[in-house]
């Protein structure tokens, strides 16, 4: 069915009050496309893979982080797609005004979940790039600058990075609690950590 102005307004005043404009809607055929300035319709007649949607109400499904990543592969440059994937797997949020929030306890998705979802997909523009990009996504970034640093250091040389092994972000290291070298804190989180080299890197901390 075609989304009507009243339905869109009700969603914008309720569960989707946080969303920026235009509101992107997925419709099954061209006849369902509306002309509302506050929305942008995308036509998809073929079935989508399991895990494409998250139910947030009796009559509302939101595209999952995995579906968002797959769809954005059709329009984003490759490195920007890797960055988006890392943000979807991060511990922070990005607001429409560009500011970051740090209230997440768990990331919306993981690199493994992205790869698994993309492996089930078919017939989507940019799918090959999405699968390649998912292999470069880092998990659990704690800030936009940690994401930027992980990409700069970990991306291959051909993509503008330094080609280092992909680091573990916000890795926990338990501290000694007794003896002459006992630490005040029970554990520390390393912004970037390379376990094979036993090297940790902190950004501005």
Language model segments and positions:
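Short gly/ser-rich loop at a beta-strand->alpha-helix junction or flexible surface loop bordering the NTP-binding
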Residues: 1-125, 147, 157
């Amino acid at each position: 069915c075609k989304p009507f102005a009243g339905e869109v307004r009700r969603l914008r005043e309720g569960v989707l009050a946080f969303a920026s404009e235009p509101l992107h809607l997925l419709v099954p055929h061209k006849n369902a496309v509306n002309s509302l300035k506050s929305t942008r319709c995308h036509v998809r007649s073929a079935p989508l893979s399991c895990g494409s949607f998250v139910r947030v109400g009796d009559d509302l499904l939101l595209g999952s982080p995995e579906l968002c990543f797959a769809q954005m592969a059709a329009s984003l440059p490759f490195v920007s797609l890797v960055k988006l994937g890392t943000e979807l797997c991060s511990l922070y949020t990005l607001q429409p005004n560009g500011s970051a929030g740090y209230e997440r306890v768990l990331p919306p998705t993981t690199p493994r979940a992205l790869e698994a979802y993309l492996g089930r997909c078919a017939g989507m523009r940019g799918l090959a790039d999405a699968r390649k990009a998912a292999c470069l996504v880092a998990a659990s970034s704690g800030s936009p600058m940690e994401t930027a640093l992980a990409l700069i250091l970990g991306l291959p040389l051909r993509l503008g990075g330094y080609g280092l092994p992909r680091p573990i972000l916000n890795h926990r290291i338990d501290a000694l609690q007794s003896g002459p070298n006992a630490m005040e804190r029970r554990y520390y989180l390393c912004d970037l950590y390379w376990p094979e080299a036993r090297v940790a890197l902190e950004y501005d901390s």
